[in-house]
Structures are given as C-alpha cells and as structure tokens.
Amino acid sequence: MAGSRTNDIKVYCSFCGKSQDDVKKIIAGNNVFICNECVALSQEIIKEELSEEVLADLTEVPKPKELLDVLNQYVVGQDRAKRALSVAVYNHYKRVSFTESRDDDDVDLQKSNILMIGPTGSGKTFLAQTLAKSLNVPFAIADATSLTEAGYVGEDVENILLKLIQAADYNVERAERGIIYVDEIDKIAKKGENVSITRDVSGEGVQQALLKIIEGTVASVPPQGGRKHPNQEMIQIDTKNILFIVGGAFDGIEEIVKQRLGEKVIGFGQNSRKIDDNASYMQEIISEDIQKFGLIPEFIGRLPVVAALEQLKTSDLIRILTEPRNALVKQYQALLSYDGVELEFDKAALEAIATKAIERKTGARGLRSIIEETMLDIMFEIPSQEDVTKVRITKAAVEGKSKPVLETA
C-alpha cells in the first residue's frame, strides 16, 4: 500500500523519522514505512557500491603476460596477434583506471581501439570473446554489414551499444567498461579508390557513424532497440572507456601490400628491400594499405593497434582439435563418456578433418560441423547400444568411405 495516510493516522518514516507532512510520499509495508527521500538515498547508495565494484575490478587487470597465458590456453597459434592484443587490452584498462583518478593537469591518454585482420576461421571473434571472458567484462558482437547510417532501412549503430548494455544486465556503468567486437568491417569499405557520387548507405556513411561512438561520445540508446522516436525514453551511455575491436578478412589486401613493397623493389635506390615470396604479407600491413582497401583515414586513425592473423595450417587445426582446454575432441569425448563410451580419433582422422576444413575455406570454425557430420549416426545409435564400450574415428570415416569402428564388451 502506498500513500501519505493510513486510516487517517499520522505516519512517520521508519528510517529518517520524518512525518508524512515533511515529505512527498510515504510507502507503507508490513509495520514499516519509508519515505520517497529514503528510497532515493537507498538507490544512490546501491549505485555507488556497484560503481565501486566496477572500479575495483579495473584495478586488478591482468598483466600482458597473464593475458597471453589465458589466450594460450584456448587459442592455438597467432602468437604475434595474441601478444599485440594482450598489450593493447592491458593498456586500455590501465588507461581507464588511470583516468578515474587523474588530475586535470595530467597527461590525457587516448583510446587504443584494435583492428584485427585475418581470413575467415582464423580466430578473430574467439580471441575477442576469450579476452572479455578473462577480464569479466560485458561483451557484445555486431555485424557491420547489418548497419546503415541514420535515415536508411537497417540497424542504427547505437543498437550495438544496446547489445552491450543488455550483456551487462542493463548496468550502464558496467557496460561503459565493456568490449564490443564489430565483425565484417571490411565489407563496409569503399569499393575502389574513386569516391562514388551516389550516397553510400552501407559504406562510408556507416564508417562515419561508427567513428563517433568508437572515439568516445555520450550516445542515446533506445531501450528496446530499433529506430529512435520523438518523446521516447533513452539510455545515456558514455563510450569513451568502451574498448572497440573491429575485424575482417580483408580479402585481397595482400595484393595491395605486394604492390606497395614491389614498387620499392623496382627502383635503383640502395634502400630498396627484397621481397621474399614466402614471407607473410599480412604482417607487413600498414595504414596506407588499409586506406587503399577502402576504410576512411579518420576511421583508421581511431584503430591504432593492428593485429594481423595468419591463415591456419593443417598442423594448427590439428592442435585446435586436441590441445586447448575446450578442444573439440575433448568435448566429444566428454559427451560419449556420459553414455559410458570411450572415444578415440586416429591421427590420420584428425589430419582428414583439418584437410576438409582447409578445402572448404572455413578454418577453425568449420571443424565442429565436420565432426558432427562424421559422428551423427554414432551419436544417434550409441545411447541405445549398451554393449558398445569404445568408438574409434578413422580417416575413412571422416571421408565418408566407412563407418567409425565400434568395440563392444
């Protein structure tokens, strides 16, 4: 029951002692009363405590070596990229912690958002997810191809922020220290070096819209998503401390790098560098190449950390299948163990799975579907076959030439 009187008897707040005449509203409970002022004060106390918890978390940011150790437990290969990400993430949250306690005359530290470049299935999304999980911060993923600039049919860039707020259970202060990964960023690059005279709905316009939230602004986000409407309540969120990681395959950027490096070889200058055909051009990418690919200079400037990921080799994919803490082979072994069955993969079978993933150009993300294809019938039949004690996956089974080998009691 809420009100200022209870059966016309004068009531007082049980917490501050003020009467109903001294406050705007008194809420009655079971033999207890609370005024609107104490409710507001309680909300402030809770908000401050939650904020202190967030700040306390930031003071315990793992050091780069510790972050790298975590990544090594889950991510195979990509050593240079993992090292670059570990340093960038550590510096970002060190900056956030420093900014909270800085004096006005201290050095103003700029954000160091991250651009990840690498082929499909090389681990870009998984790296970002693993970092967010290890830091215990809210994490959201967005697809750049679904975004359009304001006024066009599609998703506003502010909806990316809503996903982060939702991941933080609508705790805005916690969301303001989260991580957002924007995938397929290369798909909104301008095609070619000539600027189109027509309006670029999903290209440069989206880059400009993303630029505002990436560099740091107070954005108004519709609580239910969708387009903004007049008189609609908005959630205000400051993006200055949100770490943005953007990624894409950037198919063809190696040719841009080769062309740039090749131009230096053609001349007669003594500082010309010799290009090794076997060298990794991905590690040679600079801002000039990314701009030539089609991202605007202002956008590139807000992504000072560039982490290049390599195409995964057969040996890398085999390690991914077996080594990480959550390796797929371990997962399927655990699944069958619940039925009392041992699962074994022949070495040749693992090589066949990795080869298939490379042929399909799906990288690590295609490994699970290949195992599912191979084991579908087995996982269907095993629960009903109580005499089976072991399943062995062979190369022939992966290639569809025979069924997995079953051993019975």
Curated annotation (Swiss-Prot):
One of its GO terms (molecular function) is protein dimerization activity. It holds the Pfam family AAA_2. InterPro entries: AAA+_ATPase, ATP-dep_Clp_protease_ClpX, ATPase_AAA_core, Clp_ATPase_C, Clp_protease_ATP-bd_su_ClpX, ClpX_bact, P-loop_NTPase, Znf_CppX_C4. GO terms for cellular component: HslUV protease complex. ATP binds at residues 119-126. SUPFAM superfamilies: Glucocorticoid receptor-like (DNA-binding domain), P-loop containing nucleoside triphosphate hydrolases. Keywords: ATP-binding, Chaperone, Metal-binding, Nucleotide-binding, Zinc. Residues 1-54 form the ClpX-type ZB domain. Zn(2+) binds at residues 13, 16, 35, 38. One of its GO terms (biological process) is proteolysis involved in protein catabolic process. Gene3D superfamilies: 1.10.8.60, ClpX chaperone, C4-type zinc finger domain, P-loop containing nucleotide triphosphate hydrolases. Component of the ClpX-ClpP complex. Forms a hexameric ring that, in the presence of ATP, binds to fourteen ClpP subunits assembled into a disk-like structure with a central cavity, resembling the structure of eukaryotic proteasomes. HAMAP family: ClpX. ATP-dependent specificity component of the Clp protease. It directs the protease to specific substrates. Can perform chaperone functions in the absence of ClpP. NCBIfam families: clpX, PRK05342.1. Belongs to the ClpX chaperone family. This is ATP-dependent Clp protease ATP-binding subunit ClpX. It comes from Streptococcus pyogenes serotype M12 (strain MGAS2096). The gene is clpX.
